[in-house]
Each structure stands twice: as C-alpha cells, then as structure tokens.
C-alpha cells in the first residue's frame, strides 16, 4: 500500500514510561478532572443493574464532547479511554505537527472524546484528524469469517494484498 511504519509503540510501554501519570497531572493542574457521578447511559435497556457511583471524570464536555468521561472503572482499573489519553499524550510529545488517527467505523462514538482529550492535553495547539474506515467482512465458503485481535483470529493485510492485490484493498 506504500505506507511505512517507522515507530511501533505498545500500550504497556507507554504506561510504564509514566504517560498516564503525566495525563493525570496535566488534567489536575488545569482543573479538568473531578470526582462526579455520570448520568445513566441512554438507550440501553440491559442496564437495570446500573447504579450511580462517584468516579474520576475528565471534563471533556468543555472541549466539545457530549458529556464528561470516566477515567476509572468500578473495579479501580483505568478505562480504555484513560490509557488512550496516555497514548495520545505520547504522540503529542513525539510530533511537531498534527496527529492522524485511523479508526474503524465501530469507533464513531469515540471521536469527540478523543478529540477533546487531544485539545486538553495539547492546550489546543495540536489538531487531531480522524479518518474512519468501513468495516469489511471477509467470506470463506459463503461463511463470514469472524476476526478478533484479542482472540488471535485475524488475517494479515500483507496476506490479503498477496491474494487480492493492493488495488482491491
């Protein structure tokens, strides 16, 4: 496809380098986190067991997001979003220009919150460009192939290019 990756980073190494702690310090220093209670999510019929609880929240609504966002789960571990903020701070510190995210269409609801995070972490100095890709279903013998990074069931892009050609991709 003509795209070269020159930096590979793992979430674990970014957290180990202290970027989550840096995020929390930036947010605290700028009074952008607080202990609060989120409203019950709308449109979720299966949330009968949902209970309001105090949690650490990022004031993402100040930056155009629909609501403030939780940084910790009920079990005390960090949310995916908190770790993603650490990753974006890492990218902010590495770049001299704008950031580009390429996300699947299943992440559309995530765009505003991560844009808010980049604005807050960069003091509005870095622009985040989000590109969204369609979800593609691969078929084998008229059956949809279910892929998952977490389960280890996936097809490498290089294999698809070898089988189909890069123009199809």
Task: Outline where the language-model segments fall.
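Alpha-helical recognition segments enriched in aromatics with Gly/Pro capping
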Residues: 1-169
